[in-house]
A protein has these predicted regions:
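Hydrophobic packing positions in regular secondary-structure scaffolds
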Residues: 1-98, 103
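Divalent-cation
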Residues: 93, 97-230, 234
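Membrane-associated alpha-helical segments
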Residues: 206, 247, 253, 257-260, ...
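A short, charged helix-loop
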Residues: 216-239, 263, 267-280
Length: 380
């Protein structure tokens, strides 16, 4: 809805209020209730149909009096997102000293000081003024927050869940403003809840922006290392490469865990006999490890494509090129392990199903013997 439409609705509401007040008392009361409800419902529906960005733009375009009238009718649930969209001048006029907060999200800003990452306090818009970070990490950031931070640094920040296409050109590309976009999956390895988490990266003017919907151990580890070890990173690309390298290491640890679990399963399968209950448990473990192995293989191949994109684009310095090649060698090593684990999983699956078939054949033989023993003599 256009700003002019909101102006028209608010002006009509003001004129109706003036007319209502000029009526006699009895008619005034009836008209006031009916007209007030009608126009309030119309305004509420108009507000409901707008995004936070559209409402912020509308509030900036209205006169102060009209903006105050509209502001009073905006639901509290939308206030914080709209505060991110409004100009600072209009925000001060309507909300006083209230700053847009980062409720439900986590925004971390890091600058490079003496070869170490130093996290800067961030609670609202004013903390971005005069800042030249090397890494901005956003977890579960709203569209309004992404838009404001992106506009502040002159880059568009995507939703990490938007790009799920397998096409390389969709996941790894360079925008017209030289912003480098990469969309990758990182492993979240938790007992009973292991999955891939989409992460969007943007490299722009020496700043790495990372966007995701939940925290990852890989990111916590890299923040700790970069804060404590001088020279661990020298620029935003170093941070990106270290995150990819740490994800490969996390995948390696997960594969070691899969080896240990499958070794235990193998001992059970190689026993002289396996009950149906044991077989069911074994099949469950095997299926879980097969799923995890496939997830790891997919993630490291995704990382491999991202690194190849950076290398082909001549976006790395000579030392960074060596780091990327080392990560690729680690990925090649893991690929052979995932292939071996798939073979081992298939063997254990076939062996377990074989035991189930043996158990079924035993029961069939028993039923056959019982049926012959108790068969009537005249049938024999």
């Amino acid at each position: 809805m256009s700003i002019e439409k909101f102006k028209e609705m608010l002006e009509r509401q003001r004129r109706v209020d003036q007319v209502v007040r000029s009526q006699k008392m009895s008619r005034h009361e009836v008209a006031e209730v009916l007209v007030h409800k009608q126009h309030e419902a119309e305004l509420a529906n108009a507000i409901k149909g707008q995004t936070a960005a559209e409402l912020g733009e509308t509030l900036d375009g209205l006169s102060l009096e009209q903006a105050c009238e509209l502001w009073q009718r905006i639901p509290e649930a939308l206030i914080n997102d709209i505060l991110w969209e409004m100009s600072d001048e209009r925000r001060l006029e309507l909300a006083g000293g209230r700053e847009p907060d980062i409720e439900g999200s986590k925004i971390s800003i890091f600058e490079l000081v003496d070869g170490k990452l130093r996290q800067m306090p961030y609670t609202g818009k004013r903390d971005l003024e005069g800042v030249r970070p090397v890494w901005v990490d956003l977890i579960h950031a709203s569209k309004a927050q992404r838009a404001y931070i992106g506009a502040h640094f002159g880059v568009e920040l995507p939703d990490p869940l938007d790009v799920t296409d397998l096409e390389v050109s969709a996941r790894f590309h360079i925008e017209d403003n030289d912003a480098i976009h990469l969309h990758s999956n990182f492993l979240l390895d938790r007992a009973g809840d292991s999955r891939s988490v989409p992460v969007a990266f943007v490299l722009h003017r020496g700043i790495l922006f990372s966007l995701r919907e939940e925290d990852l151990p890989v990111f916590r580890l890299q923040r700790r290392l970069a804060r404590t070890q001088p020279g661990y990173v020298t620029d935003a690309v170093d941070v990106l490469l270290d995150l990819y390298g740490a994800d490969v290491e996390c995948s390696s640890d997960s594969l070691e865990n899969s080896y240990a679990i499958l070794a235990k399963v193998g001992k059970l399968v190689l026993n002289e006999s396996v009950s149906d209950e044991q077989a069911a448990s074994i099949l469950s473990d095997i299926a879980e490890e097969e799923d995890q192995n496939g997830r790891i293989r997919s993630n490291i191949l995704d990382t491999q494509r991202a690194l190849n994109f950076l290398m082909r684009g001549r976006l790395l310095t000579a030392p960074q090129m060596e780091d990327a090649k080392q990560i690729l060698r680690n990925i090649d090593s893991l690929n052979s392990h995932t292939a071996f684990l798939f073979d081992k999983i298939n063997f254990l699956m076939d062996a377990t199903i074989g035991f189930i078939n043996i158990n079924q054949n035993k029961r069939v033989n028993q039923l056959t013997i019982f049926s012959v023993v108790f068969m009537p003599i005249n049938v024999l």
